[in-house]
Swiss-Prot record:
Catalytic activity: coenzyme B + methyl-coenzyme M = methane + coenzyme M-coenzyme B heterodisulfide
Cofactor: coenzyme F430
Protein known as: Methyl-coenzyme M reductase II subunit beta
A molecular function (GO) term: coenzyme-B sulfoethylthiotransferase activity
Details of cofactor binding: Binds 2 coenzyme F430 non-covalently per MCR complex. Coenzyme F430 is a yellow nickel porphinoid. Methyl-coenzyme-M reductase is activated when the enzyme-bound coenzyme F430 is reduced to the Ni(I) oxidation state.
Binding positions for coenzyme B per the UniProt entry: G369
Subunit record text: MCR is a hexamer of two alpha, two beta, and two gamma chains, forming a dimer of heterotrimers.
Physiological role: Component of the methyl-coenzyme M reductase (MCR) I that catalyzes the reductive cleavage of methyl-coenzyme M (CoM-S-CH3 or 2-(methylthio)ethanesulfonate) using coenzyme B (CoB or 7-mercaptoheptanoylthreonine phosphate) as reductant which results in the production of methane and the mixed heterodisulfide of CoB and CoM (CoM-S-S-CoB). This is the final step in methanogenesis.
Binding site for coenzyme M: Y367
Amino acid sequence: MPMYEDRIDLYGADGKLLEEDVPLEAVSPLKNPTIANLVSDVKRSVAVNLAGIEGSLKKAALGGKSNFIPGREVELPIVENAEAIAEKVKRLVQTSEDDDTNIRLINNGQQILVQVPTTRMGVAADYTVSALVTGAAVVQAIIDEFDVDMFDANAVKTAVMGRYPQTVDFTGANLSTLLGPPVLLEGLGYGLRNIMANHVVAITRKNTLNASALSSILEQTAMFETGDAVGAFERMHLLGLAYQGLNANNLLFDLVKENSKGTVGTVIASLVERAIEDRVIKVASEMKSGYKMYEPADWALWNAYAATGLLAATIVNVGAARAAQGVASTVLYYNDILEYETGLPGVDFGRAMGTAVGFSFFSHSIYGGGGPGIFHGNHVVTRHSKGFALPCVAAAMCLDAGTQMFSVEKTSGLIGSVYSEIDYFREPIVNVAKGAAEIKDQL
């Protein structure tokens, strides 16, 4: 028996029905097989830039930006021999012939996707085993393939793994993981939140609803890891994932379509009308001025509706400007207007609006250190909302028309070209719906 009575219809990014009458728990990270596979692959996958390694060795550009070591140039036809290198890497990484190690060449051998076996993940204390094992395997594979001597072997290591272990991260490396090193996390359990918005956008190939869905899946799954989505709060996070992330009951699509020529204010008007119609909220009292105070029939469901409206308002507002910079102020003032309109708390009970205040300052106010695309849920500025703000940032970067200094192409080219090859990363909405369909009758 399901723990919750909620049942939802799941719609695609095109507004078409995918699966109906789905128990809410069928989209839970603890139950949905697609989300389980996605999280597993996030942890065990590594993108290796063979073309980058070849170029670094050829120019002796080792260890990061502006680092050149004249006289240490090494010319190796790495991309030309990508298949042989990939085969060697597979033999080094796998633990048995029939395990789930996966090696995939991408872009004619310029990149490799390496997925280490779950047996290695199972005996490791954290997820960095994937990067460390893959890095070591690639180094050895190149040395063996080209018979590199002991004097140039360290150059190969640096071209692959960067300055590590001089640094705690892989500065200057030609391998990338979606999850950053645990030592750089803002708090315990923040690993899945440590994926910048631009990476999410690149993986989903700038499809707005799929990008916000992937962001929501990662953010809300992290809530189960941090203990936020336990007990009384679990349903709130599941509803948020379903409605804001997965377009449950087509609410997100309907709000955007209805306000295609509207504003943040018209989205709020549509949302309140829909919430009243669906009996999520009701009038609690009416003042002499005619102003109506509302109360929710269901606090968790109201938060899910409000969060969906927030994402819709972001899509409408940023979509009109084709400039992502407005996402912070949209998140802020959507909540401000919504609270004045209804007398109800905003998204995430105030945390989304609070996050947006700092986000506005650090993304484009007098500080302006970085554009919206480089932020993530592990950032000291944007960590405070419990999974409801970052999907808006991902959506905004999908709609940006090239206004950003930190563009998706600049920050996330390798990540996008590699991870977008995995279908449930690229199109999470339809694949999570398939996973829900598999298990809905078993709950």
